[in-house]
């Protein structure tokens, strides 16, 4: 868990299905991360522009914008943000497209708690160096 002198990392979870959002939140919050929920790609982009987000989890299939489209647009706003795509269609084409857009990883649905946590921790360590402590308060 994050210590009192550190703010927890914030994880943006984007999925049009509230059950899927809640399932991912139930995995990452007990590990000490703060979650921000979005139900669409447009909402996710607004959140990334307006709030401090340290990692993003996107569903592949959402109305109006796919997870890949969100990822592509996001790269113009925050090129370094680690992004993980969550999809029931984890085929070679989707995976190749995701990595071309610099996704950190692709997690197949239904999600596995251990896979999600392991992938989140690895992404945070790679970008920030500390998977639990978060950022030091100013």
Task: Enumerate the language-model features and the residues they cover.
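Acidic catalytic/metal-coordinating carboxylates
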Residues: 39-43, 66-69
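C-terminal output helix
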Residues: 93, 111-121
């Amino acid at each position: 868990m994050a210590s009192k002198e550190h703010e927890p990392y914030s994880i943006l979870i984007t999925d049009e299905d509230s059950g899927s959002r809640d399932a991912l939140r139930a995995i990452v919050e007990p590990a000490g991360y703060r979650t921000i929920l979005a139900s669409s790609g447009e909402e996710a982009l607004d959140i990334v522009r307006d709030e401090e987000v340290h990692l993003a989890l996107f569903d592949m299939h959402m109305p109006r914008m796919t997870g890949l489209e969100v990822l592509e647009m996001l790269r113009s706003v925050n090129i370094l943000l680690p992004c993980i795509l969550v999809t029931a269609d984890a085929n070679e084409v989707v995976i190749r497209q995701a990595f071309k857009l610099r996704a950190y990883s692709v997690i197949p649905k239904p999600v596995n708690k251990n896979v999600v946590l392991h992938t989140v921790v690895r992404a945070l360590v790679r970008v920030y160096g500390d998977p639990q402590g978060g950022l030091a308060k100013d």
